[in-house]
A protein has these predicted regions:
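All-alpha RGS (Regulator of G-protein Signaling) helical domain and cognate RGS-like helical scaffolds
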Residues: 2-15, 22-207
C-alpha cells in the first residue's frame, strides 16, 4: 500500500476533519538518512516519483512537524501568550500534533528518532514568538511546495491538504500581529539549503 494511506487512517481517528491522506502502510526498506540537508536535497533531484521517494519525503516532512510541535509547546509554556495569540498557538499545536502522529504512523520504523531543539529567545516572549512562528510556517509551506513535483499522485494530494493548513497558520498569525495576512500573490518553493538553514535558525539542532 502507499505511504499516504496510513496517514489518512491515523487522522481519521484523531480529528473530526476528513483524512489528510488516502490508504495504509509503508512497504519495503529504506536506509536512514543522516542529515536534514540530505532530506531536502531530494527536492532538487527532481527524480521520477516513486513510493520509495514518497517515504524519503515523508521523513523530510516529519522533521518539519517535529519542529513545529516542539516550538508551539515551548511557546505556550514560556512565552506568556494571551488572547487570540494564545488561541492561535494552541490550535496550531493541535493541528501539528495530528500531522506528526499521522506521518509517524505512515513511516513506522522508518520515522527515526525525535530531534532536539534550542529555540532560544524565540519561545520566551510574544514578540519573538510571532516573528518565529511566521518564519516557521512560511518555511513549512515553502518546503512542502518544494517537494510537490517529487511526489506520487496520492501523496501529493495528501501533502496539498496539509500545506493548505500550514498556509492558514501563516496567515492567521500575521493577522493577529496586525500584519497583512497574505502579503504575496504566490508562495514560492525553497531550495534544500534554504529550508535546512531556516529550520536550523529557528531551533532544530539534531535529528
Amino acid at each position: 500500500m502507499r505511504p499516504a494511506d496510513s496517514v489518512a487512517t491515523s487522522l481519521e481517528h484523531s480529528s473530526s476533519r476528513r483524512a489528510l491522506l488516502a490508504g495504509a502502510g509503508v512497504a519495503g526498506t529504506l536506509a536512514a538518512i543522516p542529515t536534514l540537508r540530505r532530506l531536502f536535497r531530494l527536492g532538487e533531484a527532481n527524480a521520477s516519483p516513486s513510493q520509495a521517494q514518497d517515504i524519503r519525503i515523508l521523513q523530510l516532512v516529519l522533521q518539519l512537524e517535529y519542529t513545529q510541535v516542539a516550538f508551539y509547546e515551548q511557546a505556550l509554556r514560556d512565552a506568556n501568550l494571551e488572547g487570540e495569540l494564545r488561541d492561535f498557538a494552541d490550535i496550531a499545536l493541535g493541528h501539528e500534533r495530528q500531522h506528526l502522529a499521522a506521518i509517524r504512523k505512515a513511516l513506522g520504523a522508518k520515522a527515526g528518532p525525535k530531534p532536539t531543539f534550542d529555540f532560544g529567545p524565540r519561545t520566551k516572549s510574544p514578540e519573538a514568538f510571532v516573528k518565529a512562528a511566521i518564519d516557521l510556517e512560511d518555511t513549512a509551506v515553502a518546503a512542502y511546495n518544494g517537494q510537490a513535483t517529487n511526489l506520487t499522485k496520492a501523496t501529493l494530494a495528501a501533502a496539498a491538504e496539509i500545506v493548505s493548513v500550514e498556509a492558514r497558520h501563516a496567515a492567521w498569525v500575521r493577522a493577529v500581529a496586525g500584519q497583512v495576512a497574505a502579503p504575496d500573490p504566490v508562495d514560492e518553493p525553497i531550495t534544500a539549503a534554504q529550508a535546512a538553514r531556516g529550520l536550523r535558525l529557528i531551533g532544530l539542532k539534531t535529528q
